[in-house]
Design a protein with these regions (language model features):
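ER/Golgi luminal nucleotide-sugar-dependent glycosyltransferases, focusing on the catalytic module
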Residues: 1-164, 170-387
């Protein structure tokens, strides 16, 4: 007889709270407030949900740039230290193919024509596909944030409705299942996520406590960003690298959120659902279609030409958390360039982690080399798609 957990049959709205509690289906605690018929119906629903999730295609999307490509220098793409290639993508791909092999396709979005350590596109298309920045944005860009505001366009390139988004320095540290990223609510596959905002603080507080996260620090970070916005003529969009900013950014996105009407200029999204979505929950509208007219790439910063875009920068894609069933071990380092020995002590116990080894002057060439050696230790086996 299949054993269901209390998480499967109790609260369909917030299943995270009880996910670790294994309780047999006959347990009186579960059936205390529901009839046997109702409980059997819930078990049938859970079985159906598991089948729905099993059949749901899930893709991985990487944003990548290799600034060693001479073509990009000719095209004038900004040369930024944090975008220097340390072959992180090679190990990120190995981590995905090893630890979440159930993904359907891996899409690499980039301004480059090819990835220098991978075989030609036609030889790897069974699993890995390339998308050019210019095909999504209308122009090539070194900016991940520009691309992230255009996630809704990925459906046009064959990306699954539900997908896992990663920069090229994100890694899957241990084997994970679909159910670690997504679950089914009312027959619809949705990602685990958590919304953080002062408007939603009271509802989020119990979840923060459960996950051992400091919401005050997060709110201070958010307030500081907004304060900076108010004092500058142009809004500065904070690119999230590592888990320093990843606390208030997204690694997992649901395409459906962004598939309807574009927001009118100046609109502010004051409410995001922070966990389950019911069928009657109206879809959130897609964020701005960012093109040259609204944004320009200048040095290491993406600047908005209009104050109208200010609130949008901090109210949309960058207000989610990533959660999975091992949430207490997700790596959220205060600094990505801390002592390398301390860094790897944390990373080796993480299910998801990020190594941004080129984003700051504090990160020396020696540390970059150490990081690469450690990645080679963690993910030593080449994939069949590598040259």
């Amino acid at each position: 007889e299949k054993v269901y957990t209390i998480a499967n049959v109790r609260s369909r709205r917030f299943p995270l709270f009880d996910r670790e509690m294994e309780i047999p289906t006959r347990c009186k605690e579960i059936t205390k407030n529901i009839t046997e018929t109702e409980f059997e119906g819930l078990c049938e629903t859970v079985a159906m949900d598991e089948l729905i999730l099993e059949k749901e295609p899930i893709d991985v999307v990487f944003k990548y740039i290799d600034l060693s490509d001479p073509a990009l220098k000719r095209e004038g793409i900004a040369q930024i230290k944090k975008d220097e290639d340390n072959e992180e993508l090679k190990y990120a791909l190995r981590s995905v193919l090893t630890n979440i092999p159930w993904v359907r396709y891996i899409f690499i979005v980039m301004p480059n024509d090819a990835v220098r350590f991978l075989k030609p596109q036609e030889e790897i298309a069974e699993k890995i596909k390339f998308i050019r920045d210019r095909d999504v944005l209308g122009f090539d860009s070194a900016s991940s944030i520009t691309f992230e505001f255009n996630f809704w366009k990925l459906k046009n390139f064959g990306v699954s409705d539900n997908f896992i988004y990663m920069n090229d320095d994100y890694f899957i540290g241990k084997p994970l299942k679909k159910s670690d990223f997504f679950y089914v609510d009312n027959g619809k596959v949705v990602p685990y996520m958590l919304y953080n905002d002062s408007v939603d603080y009271k509802r989020s507080a119990p979840i923060f406590e459960y996950l051992n996260i400091n919401p005050l620090q997060l709110r201070m970070n958010s307030n500081e960003m907004n304060k900076q916005d108010q004092t500058k003529e142009n809004a500065k969009a904070h690119t999230s690298y590592g888990f320093r900013f990843q606390r208030t950014s997204s690694m997992i996105f649901l395409y459906d959120y962004f598939k309807h009407d574009i927001l009118a200029p100046g609109c502010r999204l004051d409410y995001f659902p922070h966990n389950a979505l019911g069928e009657n929950m109206r879809y959130l509208k897609e964020v701005y279609d960012i093109v040259r007219d609204n944004y320009k790439y200048a040095n290491d910063t993406l600047m908005a030409n209009s104050r109208k875009l200010r609130s949008l920068v901090h109210q949309t894609a960058y207000t989610f958390y990533v959660l999975n069933k091992y949430h207490n071990r997700i790596n959220h380092l205060q600094d990505c360039y801390i002592d390398i020995s301390e860094l790897w002590l944390v990373v080796c116990n993480a299910d998801l982690f990020c190594i941004n080894e080129g984003g700051d002057k504090k990160y020396s060439q020696r540390m970059k080399e150490n990081a690469k050696r450690k990645l080679e230790t963690l993910f030593p086996i080449p994939t069949k798609y590598e040259l």
